[in-house]
Regions:
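Metallocofactor- and cofactor-centric catalytic cores in central/energy metabolism, strongly enriched
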Residues: 267-271, 275, 505-506, 697-703
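Contiguous, well-ordered alpha-helical segments that form the cores/surfaces of helical PPI scaffolds
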Residues: 493-506, 526, 683
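Short, solvent-exposed positions on alpha-helices
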Residues: 34, 55-58, 491, 515, ...
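Charged, amphipathic alpha-helical regulatory modules used
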Residues: 1-107, 702-707
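Long insertion/accessory domains within large nucleic-acid-processing enzymes
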Residues: 671-708
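Conserved catalytic cores of very large enzyme subunits
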Residues: 86-90, 96-489, 510, 514-680
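Core of folded catalytic or high-affinity ligand/protein-binding domains
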Residues: 477-478, 485, 489, 495-496, ...
């Protein structure tokens, strides 16, 4: 049996601890009120006789109290209760010592593998984790209702980002970068005016990204099309300066060539600034900013030609990669690139197909960019095309006072995720029981999400001036409440879910790709979506359905359920649950069928979704990859390619670092297994990860089959 401690950690059951606690109470009462060792053993035997695989400490103590009362040892029972209360006071005084000290000793494996883009060996990252442990502790003991904390500990739900809940900050956003560049902003009390050149605009953009990232805990996105006007400003400035310097001594063609050369130099330098700054900056969160660059060539854009040059340069530099410490070009994890397919660049003879061809080459080698189909997205979002907030979180359409759609300058309040497989396990194949329990768990999620929402209601704009006062989200006066931005759908708040495949297998005995399973899975998704829609109507808060990325959660839920319910074939035995609505990573299905199947769930999960296919090395078969990109444009809103992009620093091997039978990363050429001497980049959950993963996610990565 396993015991869940109050801090959420899980330890082996030890009956001697129960006996010792009763004996301590025994020593405090007169002889006639004491309990013999035989009767103490009998109480413990009754607890063990329940044969539960997993119990909370509180539940064990409740059973001890009941046992003492049943023995008519009321004085002893009272003394035990007082002892229990005093122990609780000690725990409330400090419950984080061991987790923090184990982190500093580099012995906290769970924390070290929680986020594949955080290196817990680095002092700045450790500081963030130490603060996070304190926040988790305060959240569990004080800030959340006890029943919410208990549901989280039992794996019924996951209250995301408890390590930041103690602070009045939110999840992710679409930075209103156009407004900040055009109208200026303020950082660290210093006025930043509108840039006069592309290079300066790129520098300011990276400064904004860093400042924003340090004041929220989730991802952010920047629409690169706002930089087009600054490239034109640079062109005009160069033309003016060169014309003056040459004093009419060059013809028009030569002047154009000289200007083009200067523009291309600045273009390359500016984009390089963004790429290197993002990959070398470390925010107060102890990591590089989780940022997405949105690459969308809009036909009605007055700076379309400039933006085409910018997008092309971003892709060229990503294709080249960034040098590691050994001087070898590798795949960087950030920034994430999202490239929009539209009629003029969907590989059907459009004007900008050449940029899409470059994007395909880049995806084949560096995994990014991911692809959004403007055609399909317009069908789901009232004719609009806009960036996800970070990885996959999408806003709902919202109109300002003038009736114009607005997406930039909006944000997500937070996420709570539902463990679908656990509901299936508890229902034991009984659909009536399943739907009843699902409704109960949804109510639990709603109440947990309202904790998220209520925590932000008292926030004033002074808490993060870059967000609330200087344009990233709004331009509120100092001291103004942000509460109005929490209502009316301006911001979203997300119900996440994980394990649609597993819950379908539990309830129907088949994958959700099977027709019978698909019908059930769609009904589950519709029920989740209806809950969000109903809550939105009842509260005027922007509830949205979100396919949880589950980088570490895929393992946490599966681990808890295995400990509680034992090994269940094809469910808890794998060591992980499947992300959101995705097809089981082990299931053999081709890329076209996978995208077609998953596209129907994207229409329901509009608060957050992304689909992927695993591909082999396609660098010498780009035509096949182009066919998939054409298919994406016509069939699915948001899609990505997973390939392998690794490097062994010991022998110079450039290919796939494998996961061996011991679940360890190993170079197939020289058998190097030292993770500090290899660069491994994998798709973790929409983002790329490069600092390795927990045991569950590693098993999931190892199990992935090719779809092309």
């Amino acid at each position: 049996m396993k015991v869940i401690k109050r801090d959420g950690s899980i330890v082996d059951y030890d009956r001697s601890k129960i006996s010792a606690a009763i004996q301590k109470a025994n020593a405090e009462v007169p002889e006639e009120d004491r309990l013999s060792q035989d009767r103490i053993d009998a109480i413990i035997d009754r607890i063990e006789g329940l044969k539960r695989p997993r119990m909370l400490v509180e539940d064990i103590q409740d059973l001890v109290e009941q046992g003492l009362v049943a023995e008519n040892k009321f004085h002893l029972a009272k003394t035990y209760i007082i002892y229990r209360y005093n122990r609780a006071l000690v725990r409330k005084a400090n419950t984080t010592d061991e987790s923090i000290l184990s982190l500093l000793r580099n012995e906290n494996k769970e924390l070290a593998e929680e986020n594949s883009n955080k290196n817990t060996m680095i002092a700045a990252t450790q500081r963030d984790y130490i603060a996070g442990e304190v926040s988790r502790d305060l959240t569990r003991r004080i800030l959340l209702p006890e029943y919410i904390s208990k549901a989280h500990d039992e794996g019924a739900i996951h209250f995301h980002d408890a390590d930041y809940f103690v602070q009045p900050i939110f999840n992710c956003c679409l930075i209103n970068i156009g407004d900040m560049l055009d109208n200026g902003t303020v950082m660290n009390g210093k006025l930043i005016e509108s840039p006069k050149s592309f290079q300066v605009a790129c520098t300011v953009t990276t400064q904004i990204i860093a400042c924003v990232a340090s004041n929220q805990y989730g991802g952010q996105s920047v629409d690169m099309s706002h930089l087009g006007k600054y490239l034109r400003r640079s062109r005009e400035k160069f033309r003016k300066h060169i014309s003056y310097e040459c004093a009419g001594q060059v013809d028009g063609a030569t002047l154009d060539r000289l200007v083009d050369d200067r523009v291309r130099d600045e273009l390359k330098s500016g984009v390089q600034t963004i790429q290197y700054q993002i990959n070398t900056l470390m925010t107060t969160n102890g990591q590089s900013p989780f940022v997405t660059l949105f690459l969308n060539l809009r036909e009605d854009d007055p700076y379309l030609e400039e933006n085409a040059l910018i997008v092309e340069e971003v892709l060229r530099q990503r294709l080249e990669g960034i040098k590691n410490e050994a001087g070898v070009y590798i795949t960087p994890a950030f920034p994430k690139l999202v490239y929009v397919l539209d009629e003029h660049n969907c590989l059907k003879g459009g004007k900008y197909d050449y940029i899409t061809e470059l994007a395909v080459r880049c995806s084949a080698k560096r995994m990014y960019p991911d692809y959004i189909s403007a055609k399909k997205m317009k069908e789901n979002y009232e004719g609009n095309v806009f960036s996800p907030m970070g990885c996959r979180s999408f806003l709902s359409p919202w109109k300002d006072a003038n009736g114009n759609y607005q997406f930039e300058g909006r944000f997500n309040q937070g996420v709570v995720s539902l463990n679908l497989p656990q509901i299936g396990i508890l229902s034991r194949g009984d659909e009536d029981a399943f739907w009843k329990l699902l409704d109960q768990r949804l109510q639990l999620c709603f109440e947990a999400l309202m904790c998220r929402h209520n925590a932000l209601k008292s926030v004033r704009s002074d808490s993060s001036p870059i967000h609330w006062q200087y344009g990233a989200i709004a331009r509120l006066p100092k001291g103004a409440p942000i509460e109005p931005l929490l209502y009316g759908g301006y911001s979203s708040i997300s119900l996440g879910y994980i394990g649609l495949y597993e819950v379908t297998k539990l309830m129907k005995g088949v994958s959700h790709t099977d027709p019978q399973g698909q019908d059930f899975a769609l009904r589950v998704m519709d029920r989740l979506r209806k809950a969000c829609d109903d809550w939105k109507k009842e509260t005027n808060i922007g509830f949205a359905l979100y396919g949880t990325p589950a980088e570490s959660l895929c393992y946490r839920f599966a681990r808890i359920d295995k400990e509680r319910f034992g090994t269940i074939p094809d469910i808890t035995d794998k060591g992980y649950y499947t992300n959101s609505y995705h097809v089981d990573v082990r299931e053999h299905i081709d890329a076209f069928d996978k995208f077609t199947f998953e596209s129907q769930f994207q229409k329901i999960s509009t608060g957050g979704c992304i689909s992927y296919v695993e591909i082999p090395n396609m660098r010498h078969n780009l035509e096949a990859l182009k066919e998939v990109v054409r298919f994406i444009y016509n069939n699915i809103q948001y899609a990505e390619f997973n390939t392998k992009s690794d490097y062994c620093q010991v022998c110079g091997y450039d290919g796939e670092i494998i996961i061996n039978d011991d679940n360890q990363w190993e170079c197939p050429a020289c058998h190097n297994m030292d993770q500090t001497k290899m660069n491994v980049t994998r798709r973790t959950c929409g983002y790329l990860g490069e600092n390795y993963w927990n045991v569950g996610k590693t098993k999931e990565i190892k199990s992935r089959v090719l779809h092309l």
